[in-house]
Amino acid sequence: MSGLIIVRRSRIHGNGVFAARDLPEGTELIEYTGRLITIAEADALYDEIHTGHTFLFTLNEEWIIDGNVGGNDARWINHGCAPNCIPYLHAHPRDRSKDRVIIETLRDVEAGEELQYDYGISFEVPYTPRLKKIWACRCGTPRCTGTMLKSGTHERLAG
């Protein structure tokens, strides 16, 4: 998978990951790596709901990949409302702590194009205007929802 991506400054936010060459749909780009921690450990270590910045990737109902520690270039892939990539879970049949996430292209991607996937962030609290501002999306696409938060019942409850 090496030689497919490069990291540089992004117009969306901070660093971004870009296609180093033309990539066909279905290309496996990179595994999302980092320290493996439980959801309870992540809750104790980070207050990510109020910072709008995290390299935490929820792996399953028990485990999180913490890209802050031991993470690779996958942590720099920005959110996009019209994504050209998707994270695929490769579930281990017996040990969920061995599940893996591979980022793959959703469509053909041109060399130099920024890679993005939909973060689909969700919290078990109402999506207030303040929370939406903290988790604002800056992808700039015509389909931009203005937030990285996953739409659903919490958004409707917040009114």
Task: Label every model-predicted segment.
Residues 36-42, 123-133:
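Short, Lys/Arg- and Gly-enriched loop/turn segments at beta-strand edges
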